[in-house]
Every structure is written in C-alpha cells, then in structure tokens.
A protein has these predicted regions:
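Short histidine-centered catalytic/ligand-binding loop motif
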Residues: 7-19
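Double-stranded beta-helix
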Residues: 120-180
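Catalytic core of Fe(II)/2-oxoglutarate
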Residues: 154-227
C-alpha cells in the first residue's frame, strides 16, 4: 500500500530528530490504518551508501524475502520482556508494561518504507502480492544477528515460481518523501488461521539508473500493533 503522508522531519540523517518526530508520526499512522489499541515504535534503519559502509546489512536487500515467520510472535514477546533499553523505551512511550505484548489478543507488525533521496534511484523497492505466494514457496532460515545486534529471528526466503506470471509484483516509481509504503510482515491472527501474513519484497536494479547514481536513500520503521 502506497500512502500519501508527509513528515515534519527535516534531516533524515539526524537519529535524534527521527526518534523525536518520526516515531510519533508513524505510531499515529499505524493506529489509524490498523485500528489497534497501541502501536510500539522502536528503532529505525537508514539504507544509504554511508550506512552500508558501516555494516553490509544496511545496504538494500536484493533477494526476495519476507521479514518474519510464524515464530515471530514468541520472539517479539520475549524481546519486549527483556532488559534492553530500546523495547523498554518503546513501552514507556506507550505507557505499557513489559507483559503488554504477550497479553495482547493479536499482534500485527506493519513496516513503513519511505524514500528520502532522489525520486528515481538505483535500487527501488518492489512488493509481491501475498495471496500469489503460497506457504510452500517460503523457505525458513534463521538470522542469528542483524547488523551486529543480538536479536535473533526466523525469516522467509521466497523460492522462484514455476511460471513467471505466478507471483504478482508491484513497484512505485519516483516516490517522494511525502509518500510511504506500508507492508504487513507478521499477523498472529492470520498466522494462527493459516492465512498469508507475509509480504515478499526486494530491492531491484532500475535498468535506467546507473549503480550509485543516484544511490538509494530510504528509511524504515516497524510498528508492533497490539489489539
């Protein structure tokens, strides 16, 4: 889903400004879109050449994946009950206790992706219709550490389809910073009923843009929506 949505952030490289302004903006958007009671927002990822030099995990991901498997429900509950500062701060901002996630009737993860660089970049993002990808086409693998962190999780790789027209792909060319993509990456309710909760996605090389000229600059945040 592509949404027209502006932000008051003026410097996307300023982590403090992003945390103080953008987290609140995206929390409100997540609640409006989902109807959830609470939305926890903690951490963000800037994907740009400078960040990629610091850790390769911050480069645009050029293979088809969906972030989380069925095991993410337990992992995110454990995470918010940990002693780490980031989840504790997110709970504090929402005036919630550490058991709030585990005691929720439903957990929904919404990811928000925003282009903060040139409208036509070298590695834009493409999304695949979840209904066109079966569970049998998803391959689980474990990420023990992402960008040097200590939060491990299981993720989906997506197998190539039998025919080129099976998976339905969408891209949103020339996005500006006044637009945001929303994708669902986990839903405990849909997972429990065997319905697709994944959204396969990947960066891809725009054949009309030379590599790095201009390079992609984007920001991602993830909302843990509680019902």
């Amino acid at each position: 889903m592509c949404i027209r949505d502006s932000s008051e952030v003026t410097d996307w490289d300023d982590d403090e400004e992003v945390a103080s302004i953008y987290y609140g903006e995206m929390t409100s958007l997540a609640k409006d879109l989902s109807g959830c009671s609470h939305a926890l927002m903690e951490g963000h990822i800037n994907r740009n050449p400078e960040q990629a030099l610091m850790h390769p995990d911050y480069a645009p991901i050029q293979f088809v994946h969906s972030d989380f498997t069925e095991t993410y429900g337990k992992a995110i509950c454990d995470y918010y009950e940990s002693d780490e500062d980031s989840p504790r701060n997110a709970l504090k901002r929402a005036n919630l206790g550490p058991d709030a996630v585990r005691n929720s009737a439903r957990i929904l993860i919404l990811q928000f992706w925003r282009n903060v660089g040139e409208p036509q970049m070298d590695l834009p993002l493409a999304l695949c219709d979840a209904e066109s990808v079966s569970r049998a086409e998803l391959q689980d693998f474990h990420v023990a550490s992402y960008a040097g962190g200590d939060f491990g999780f299981d993720t989906f790789g997506v197998k190539a389809p039998d025919t080129n027209d099976r998976h339905r792909w969408f891209a949103f060319p020339k996005m500006t910073s006044d637009e945001v993509l929303m994708l669902r990456t986990y839903d405990s309710e849909r997972a429990a009923s065997g319905k697709p909760f994944w959204t396969p996605h990947s960066a891809f090389q725009d054949p009309n843009v030379p590599a790095g000229n201009p390079a992609r600059k984007s920001i991602e945040v993830r909302a843990t929506c509680l019902f």
